Structure formats: C-alpha cells, structure tokens
Amino acid sequence: LYAKRGTPLHSLICGGAQERGMRAGTENLPAIAGMAAALREACANLEQNAAYVAGLRDRLIAGLETIPHSLLSGDRKNRLAGNVNFCFEGVEGEDLLLDAKGICASSGSACTSGSLEPSHVLLAVGVPYEAAHGSLRLSLSAENTPEEVEYLLKAVPEVVTRLRSMSPVWRDLEEGRKSHVI
C-alpha cells in the first residue's frame, strides 16, 4: 500500500492487520505469481511482437488505401504498431461497424467513443470534418493473423461499397453536387 505520509486512510475491509491495519486478507499469491510470469513473457517478446503487429498494420493500411476516397488518419509510420484509423468519404462511421461480419471495430477515435460528433483528434491531425464522420478504428495485436487481415481487406471494401450505394451524401458527391474532400 502506497500513501503519502499524513494522508488520512480508512480501511475498506475490516479484519486482519495486513498493510498496517488498512487491508484485511491474505494476498492472492497464485495470481501475483501468474501476473509476474505473464509480464516476463510479454516483456521478453515485446520487440518481436511489435514488429509482427507493425507488419500486419502495414498490410492493412496498404489494402484499405486502395478504396477510393479513403484517408489514413495520422502519420503512416509514426504510430502505434497495432493502430489503424481510416476515414471513408460518404459513409457514416457508426454504420461502418462490422459486427455482422464478426469484426470488432470502433468509429472515431478512442477519446470520442459514443459521441456523434467527429473526433476532435482526427480534426486536429488534418482530417476534413466531412471525412471524419466516416472514421473506422481498427486495433491489432500479436494474437491476430495474416488471414484475419486478409478477411478485413475483403469485408471492409464490401461494406463501404454497400453503404455508399445507400448514401445520399455519396450520391451528391458522385453526381457533382458536392466536392470530394478526400
């Protein structure tokens, strides 16, 4: 238990005198040992896993940028290994969610999950307001496979094409009543 000297603390669980009388109960030694083993393994493979995930990310980026009027959000290389965020013009982000295809994804940025407004972060990195509405955030890990990335690269263009075919905004863009921003 870490606390600044003089900070008044009150016990949450009454009983034994562990942690200077502030926390009753015995530490969960099996869980502590398991956490230590998990941390050792994670740290031992950190660079290898980061390189593997960055390779998956780069393949995903290369495939998604073939979709017309799509935009990678942020810098191509100076980003987290497992982060990919794309904007697709003429599509609303919440419609892009791919649960029906068995894919877990989010719209916008992590800091604005649940908001209908476009992400202030995406706007700050230069994504046009209209395009930020069609944002799709995908996260990858060392547990993902190249086959899963290929599945994404098949599913996302299909969903974008289907949504654009129903979108009045996309129709206006394609018929020249509005100008493309990406």
Give short role names for the model-derived ranges.
Residues 10, 71-73, 106:
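Structural detector of well-ordered beta-strand residues that form the stable sheet scaffold
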Residues 84-137, 142:
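Conserved C-terminal alpha-helix-loop-beta "cap" of PLP-dependent enzymes
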Residues 28-32, 46-57, 89, 93, ...:
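Generic structural signal for well-ordered, non-membrane alpha-helical segments
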Residues 43-96:
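Conserved PLP-dependent catalytic core of the aminotransferase class-I/II
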Residues 1-50:
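Conserved core segment of the aminotransferase class I/II
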Residues 39-46, 57, 64, 68, ...:
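Structural signal for hydrophobic packing residues in well-ordered secondary-structure cores
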Residues 10, 29-40, 61, 97, ...:
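Predominant activation on well-ordered alpha-helical scaffold segments within soluble catalytic domains
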Residues 118-182:
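PLP-dependent enzyme catalytic core of the Aspartate aminotransferase-like
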